[in-house]
Amino acid sequence: ADEVAMLDSQIRRYNAEGSLNMQLVVNEPNAFGRSLMAHYGKFRNVTNYIALTGPKSNDTEAKLGYYGEKIVLEAQKAGLNTCWVGLSFSKKNTSIDIPDGNKLYALIAIGHGAESGATHRIKTPQQISDDYATAPDWFKRGVDYALLAPTALNQQKFHFQWLGDNRVKASRGIGFFTKMDLGIACCHFELGAGIPIYWQ
């Protein structure tokens, strides 16, 4: 109950900040069918998830990535395991309310994992930032943290450029879920930098 209350509180907060419509669904076994978690082997009996819903607009996916990852990090602090799920779920079997003008973009599965997640191969800092060698320490920390962010298929198709002062340009490559991945990476970048970032 405490975990549900914590997640509900986080979701309400970030929905308000981001003008989103994320929803927590508990004890609902149908969204994943039989295939997803059997393939990944990460959770036992997943019936809880956050539905990442928001307006049909260009910036929604990045915002869902950014705010969704904030919730993920809080959930992990509370001892929960999480998994971003972009494709392997059944939209028709989810029991969520999608308002007019909104769309379901992805889910975050939440549960008590059978095992801890593994570390995946990552790019080097220089591969995602041409400014890494000459930028301030806070920027380097941001890049280092961004490389720890989960991305679809571990593709890490994002790039950070230091523009002087606290200004940073974040851009993405082409591919599935790169908008959401960029939002997740920006969340990690801010954590690493430890200072307010003015995104350009």
At which residue positions do the language-model features occur?
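Acidic, surface-exposed loops and disordered segments
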Residues: 1-200
